[in-house]
Amino acid sequence: MYFYKKYLHFFFVVSKFKFFLKMQVPFGCNMKGLGVLLGLFSLILAQQLPDLPRTQHPPKRELKYWCTYVPQCDFCWDCQNGICKNKIMETQLIDSNHSIVNCRVSRNSETQTCFYEISSKMPNHFSMSCSHPTPYIGNEIFMKKVGGDYMTLLTLKQYCLYFIISIAFAGCFVYAVRKNLRLNTTIKLLTLLSILVYLAQPVLNRPLSIFYTKQFLPRTYTPPTRELDYWCTYAKHCDFCWECRKGICKNKVLDDMPPFIIQNDYINKCSIARYFDRCMYFIEPKIPYIHYMNCSLPTYYG
């Protein structure tokens, strides 16, 4: 329901935008209207996703699914009889086989921190910073885990691109003022530039969606063998995970897959991407056969 409201709000703004284009008003008022439109667009982009809910005491039959939710904070607990073992990272301040009574994990979207309770007697909470998995860009040389210099390089690339975009927008505005262009022509120029900026998002490894600007969900390609667990952790954002061995991809999360693909079907590319609320993976030899699956956040345990 949350995302449906955002879509309805977006289409309402678009309809008002089309109506505004047909109006012929003085140039001074046009600039005010343009400012209002840009403000509405910024408001849409600034909308926050809802906080990720707390998970607590998953039943044994749901352990895989609960563990699927936890990797959004880059760690995953395999909980059996009160013993939680970290399946992703070994170099933590807490022992991998430490007894965690409650196995409780929560995420605060404002502070970007995760908490899990070590003992029910003292409540001792350990805070861990959350970060999104480093994207794979298709070349094994550039594949690094979180903590390397890749994110810094990506941030610099973003700043450079945004600086160029700012200059382009300012240039369009100055050109429109000097030439005394009508509002219709001015907005067409800015709209064209906005479309170009929107299509340039894959350069920054970001999804083509204004509703997921707060998430870093880049495209993943075939990972090296040593990175399979980490790549599989990222793929679980779409509620399925492929264990790829020599081109054979086995689904580790869901057994009741649609009839379009068999659990042990041969998938040559083993690539997963997320656009809007869908994931896709490529199947051989039916090129370019693409099967779409709806994405959703795992159900939490209250």
UniProtKB/Swiss-Prot annotation:
Family designation: Belongs to the asfivirus MGF 110 family.
Membrane-related topology note: Multi-pass membrane protein
Species per Swiss-Prot/TrEMBL record: African swine fever virus (isolate Tick/South Africa/Pretoriuskop Pr4/1996)
InterPro entries, per the entry: ASFV_fam_110 (IPR004848)
Name of the protein this chain belongs to: Protein MGF 110-11L
Pfam families: v110
Keyword list, A-Z: Glycoprotein, Host membrane, Membrane, Transmembrane, Transmembrane helix
Function: Plays a role in virus cell tropism, and may be required for efficient virus replication in macrophages.
CC terms in the record's Gene Ontology section: host cell membrane; membrane
